[in-house]
Amino acid sequence: APIRKYDITQCALYKCRTKKRLEHLLCLEPGGLKIIDSIIRYHKFEIDKKHSDEKREITAPDKILKAIQRRILYLLHRVIRPEWLISGEKQKCYIDNGKAHLDGKYVLTVDIKKFYDNCTREPVYQFFVQKLKTSPDVAKKLTDIITYNGGIPTGCPTSQIMAFYAYSDMFSEIADLAKQCGCKFTLYVDDMTFSSTKPFSPNQLRQMIDCVLRKYGHKPKYPKVKYYGPSDYKPITGTVVTPEQSLAVPNGLQNTIYDAFQKVKPLIGTEACSEEDAKQILSLKGQIQAARN
């Protein structure tokens, strides 16, 4: 069933003006915010980047902090966000990003360079003050809970939604530019996709996007700015839109599914399996489902 969503003015955090109220909303003991600094702890680890030999560093919160961040996410996730936002939205996934552009014969893809590294603390604070109308001290506490070392860490439950909210004005400006150029726009974290049934000037749109990004302290990853015509296969966040306007599974995902199947193959016919094996089976199911869509 579709999730009932409401305007930001209906969010429980809206116009939260006292720390006592914030403690109640975050399910903390009275006075719990006073000791918040002592539980702000993170650990770092590396994961493989998809379809690349590079590593991605993840900064993740410890258990207690993660639970509070999850509560903030819960309070924000039912707020209505723009239709063009795909990432972090319940009942949407990267497949929907590809599907949104099936009619687009002409496609421009733009990635933001080191997006998370350049997401700073100040726009997060301003989101709470200006959009959620909290008092400055409440905004500061919320910002302390979900930022680290002056930025948005990559491994928090709140990371995706806050990276969007901190720069929602920037993305809205880009959505308006797309509209002016007659393009459909979608956003998946830092991947922006623009498509149209008619030819448009990719250079003109790219220059305008560049200006908006720089205004907010970001810039495009130039090697990843790509323009595709009607006869091209168009890679869009883990999917491929074919010239026949259907969605295909890229070879990378096919290989991932094959490799994952080889790992779980010895388990066929066995009664019990370890928690790790169960996780691998669930992961394989998810990948097959993604490929089917």
Residue ranges, per PLM feature:
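Catalytic palm active-site di-aspartate
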Residues: 109-113, 155, 159, 180-197
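Short amphipathic beta-strand starts and helix->beta connectors
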Residues: 92-95, 177-181
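Long, hydrophobic, amphipathic alpha-helical segments used as structural scaffolds
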Residues: 79-84, 178-185
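Right-hand nucleic-acid polymerase module
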Residues: 1-49, 54-110, 115-137, 141-149, ...
